[in-house]
């Protein structure tokens, strides 16, 4: 059974959560993915499918500022869930607050400024004769200057909407 965004609209999120809790004896798990429009999200969902029953993962909320890409990725994820015969609800949240509210785990995987900013960082560094990749050095420093303020905003939101959530940061620059 595949739970798509359309199906989710028929049952409000809180009602769905209550329904899951009653069926599973109060044990459900929600994961939120901030930056969920990235292509690796589909791989992440595929990995969760292999473990979702064992870990009682029932719900994954995807959020990204690129709504068009997010819609495509959510549909791909729903297809992966359907093909696997899984019962994992994967939906595109309307905003970051909806995504993280009630989450047990939050995964951050965002790229502030998109590929354009990454390319600029790398090209500037290379013109100066140094390695320009986004995880360390000049490129990593530029990336961190753009990324850290936004990550701190998300941390504040998570703290207020999901105070017990664990945060897994896969956002570069991971080396700084």
Language model features with spans:
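Short acidic low-complexity segments
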Residues: 89-102
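Gly/Ser/Thr-rich loops at beta-strand to alpha-helix junctions
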Residues: 37-41, 67-68, 169-176
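NAD(P)-binding Rossmann-fold cofactor-contacting core
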Residues: 55-76
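Short, Lys/Arg-enriched N-terminal segments with co-localized hydrophobic residues
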Residues: 8-28
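N-terminal Rossmann-like dinucleotide-binding module
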Residues: 31-56
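Short glycine-/small-residue-rich Rossmann-like dinucleotide-binding loops
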Residues: 104, 111, 172
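Rossmann-fold NAD(P)-binding glycine/threonine-rich loop
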Residues: 116-176
